[in-house]
């Protein structure tokens, strides 16, 4: 009897590690389909870098006196960002803008004047000259991908449409140098070629304080740009 009990106990001890190993390797994986839920993951997951080139128009005190074609100037941008959910993301973007317009030649050194008179606008009471200057705008935006927020949450969708709002800091690099808080808003459209590459089209408006172009007026200033 004692010998049988000993053999039974020995068999039980031998089987214990096998049961422990089996239970220790069992893994349960859950996938969330909640498009509003923020998942904790690696910092680099769902991050992106974007580059853009296009055109912009500045809205200053006298710029409307210049034809549209003469006000159109180059715009460049670079951004880094991250999508926390399929519908909500953030980015930090820098825009380099060349601005063209008009300034009033009533002081010894008109703001950003090229010295060239605006045809038909350089007579008595106007004294307008063409102007141009370079500026930068660094801003942080919150983006909302409406096709995922209000759609069927299809992560394989080729198209994304993301309105955004943000705040930043704009600075004119040419004398007279000026700076301003910038309010940024716009619409970003994307076509996803594959999981790595996408083509973007970004229509962006910027609200700026009066005087950034070197002239004080009665209202705020702004910029409208399109890059892709």
Predicted regions and their residues:
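Bacterial Sec-dependent N-terminal signal peptides
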Residues: 1-27
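Residues on the lipid-exposed face of transmembrane beta-strands in outer-membrane beta-barrel proteins
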Residues: 51-55, 78-82, 92, 140-146, ...
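Predominantly the C-terminal beta-signal and adjacent terminal strand-loop region
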Residues: 99-105, 196-228
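Gram-negative (and chloroplast) outer-membrane scaffold detector with strong preference
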Residues: 86-181
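Extracellular loop and loop/strand-boundary signature of outer-membrane beta-barrel proteins
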Residues: 37, 61-66, 123-131, 171-175, ...
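Short loop/turn motifs that connect adjacent beta-strands in outer-membrane beta-barrel proteins
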Residues: 36-46, 87, 148-160, 193-196
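Residues that define the transmembrane beta-barrel architecture of outer-membrane proteins
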Residues: 45, 68-76, 134-138, 157-159, ...
């Amino acid at each position: 009897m004692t010998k049988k009990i000993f053999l039974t106990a020995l068999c039980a001890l031998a089987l214990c590690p096998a049961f422990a190993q089996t239970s220790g390797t069992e893994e349960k994986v859950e996938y969330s389909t909640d498009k509003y839920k923020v998942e904790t993951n690696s910092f680099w997951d769902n991050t992106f870098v974007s580059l853009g080139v296009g055109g912009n128009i500045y809205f200053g005190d006298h710029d409307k006196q210049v034809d549209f074609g003469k006000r159109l100037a180059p715009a460049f941008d670079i951004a880094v960002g991250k999508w926390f959910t399929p519908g909500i993301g953030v980015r930090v973007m820098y825009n380099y803008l060349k601005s063209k317009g008009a300034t009033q030649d009533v002081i010894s050194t008109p703001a950003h004047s090229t010295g060239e008179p605006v045809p038909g606008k350089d007579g008595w009471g106007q004294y307008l000259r063409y102007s141009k200057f370079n500026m930068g705008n660094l801003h942080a935006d919150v983006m909302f991908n409406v096709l995922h927020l209000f759609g069927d949450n299809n992560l394989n969708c080729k198209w994304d449409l993301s309105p955004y709002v943000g705040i930043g800091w704009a600075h004119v690099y040419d004398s007279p140098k000026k700076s301003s808080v910038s309010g940024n808003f716009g619409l970003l459209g994307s076509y996803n070629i594959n999981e790595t590459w996408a083509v973007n089209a970004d229509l962006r408006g910027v609200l700026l304080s009066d005087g950034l172009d070197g002239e004080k007026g009665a209202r705020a200033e702004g910029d409208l740009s399109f890059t892709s």
